[in-house]
Amino acid sequence: MDSNTVSSFQVDCFLWHVRKQVVDQELGDAPFLDRLRRDQKSLRGRGSTLGLDIEAATHVGKQIVEKILKEESDEALKMTMASTPASRYITDMTIEELSRDWFMLMPKQKVEGPLCIRIDQAIMDKNIMLKANFSVIFDRLETLILLRAFTEEGAIVGEISPLPSFPGHTIEDVKNAIGVLIGGLEWNDNTVRVSKTLQRFAWGSSNENGGPPLTPKQKRKMARTARSKVRRDKMAD
């Protein structure tokens, strides 16, 4: 096992513990608490994968951080903070929408890279909006917290979330997963739109009809799907 992988996990465990103390003292806001909960799931998954105890890793992580802080001068810390870009937290969804439980009548789940996609295949002929909470750096999506698909009535019919046991994903991972989710929903004649906020930070542009710009590969896939559907409809007639 790579020593850097272990030390990274140990430091992450300790920093999570520090952030938990901030929340316990009621100093954290809603996005801070949301990230804390999701990072806890991620750490549990990483600990299981690495075969490491989280409590023991937290103690070692504390020692690593304390050693770094002893060697770090105040001036160096100021320079580091000044040169490091800060990420922003973007919220399409309210806390209620983010934390609401939901169930599927005809569940389908698919893993696309480090992301898990869930779709209710029972949903048909609906207008659906994709909304997400995520962090942004350099005006580009950095980390997806959670994406959900909502009907006009407010029902949740789909979701994309990071896999706790597979930390880290790229903007391309997110866009590919969104393509899969849209394809699954449109298969049942649903009309899917993507929030302007998500379009802006994931694709760098927005589409008037609410659809994200498609790659040539996605366009070919959608064309094949459309031809297949037309053939099925003709056979049914």
From Swiss-Prot:
GO terms for molecular function: protein serine/threonine kinase inhibitor activity; RNA binding. A motif (Nuclear localization signal) lies at residues 34-38. The keyword Aminoacyl-tRNA synthetase does not apply. Residues 223-230 are annotated as: PABPN1-binding. Keywords: Eukaryotic host gene expression shutoff by virus, Host cytoplasm, Host gene expression shutoff by virus, Host mRNA suppression by virus, Host nucleus, Host-virus interaction, Inhibition of host innate immune response by virus, Inhibition of host interferon signaling pathway by virus, Inhibition of host PKR by virus, Inhibition of host pre-mRNA processing by virus, Inhibition of host RIG-I by virus, Inhibition of host RLR pathway by virus, Interferon antiviral system evasion, RNA-binding, Ubl conjugation, Viral immunoevasion. Residues 1-73 are annotated as: RNA-binding and homodimerization. A motif (Nuclear export signal) lies at residues 137-146. Residues 217-237 have a biased composition (Basic residues). One of its GO terms (biological process) is symbiont-mediated suppression of host gene expression. It is found in: Host nucleus; Host cytoplasm. InterPro entries: NS1 (IPR004208), NS1A (IPR000256), NS1A_effect_dom-like_sf (IPR038064), uS15_NS1_RNA-bd_sf (IPR009068). Upon interferon induction, ISGylated via host HERC5; this results in the impairment of NS1 interaction with RNA targets due to its inability to form homodimers and to interact with host EIF2AK2/PKR. Residues 205-237 are annotated as: Disordered. Belongs to the influenza A viruses NS1 family. HAMAP family: INFV_NS1. The dsRNA-binding region is required for suppression of RNA silencing. Inhibits post-transcriptional processing of cellular pre-mRNA, by binding and inhibiting two cellular proteins that are required for the 3'-end processing of cellular pre-mRNAs: the 30 kDa cleavage and polyadenylation specificity factor/CPSF4 and the poly(A)-binding protein 2/PABPN1. In turn, unprocessed 3' end pre-mRNAs accumulate in the host nucleus and are no longer exported to the cytoplasm. Cellular protein synthesis is thereby shut off very early after virus infection. This is Non-structural protein 1. It comes from Influenza A virus (strain A/Port Chalmers/1/1973 H3N2).
